[in-house]
């Protein structure tokens, strides 16, 4: 049996660096900024949770693992889906060896530009910091440093 490692690189945040627990009310405010995601989450709540959701854990784990686009990542996954829908920017959710979750904007190859929105083609570092801040401030008052990340994992 072999063991492989991989690295993800990009500019972004480690959502596990947040110290305060995210409240369900704030998390739902974040989800509501993306109408299609909100409908998916609402369907999950109605069908899988009998119309009630009691903890952020239900969304971070159960929803993300069963219905999320990347199926892991907790808050990073929710932010990924919101930003993808609202801002039309494709980010990457990644997890390191220690289970820490990241949301990053990876380096882009020139031949992928034809698939990008005009907004993404003209994205600046400042724009990216503002986007992360905009959506993080819906769920927390904490500041996360947006910086270059090197994420290593394996399996």
Predicted regions and their residues:
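C-terminal or internal capping secondary-structure element at the end of a domain, subdomain, or sheet
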Residues: 141-155
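Acidic (Asp/Glu-rich) sequence patches and key acidic residues
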Residues: 1-139, 155
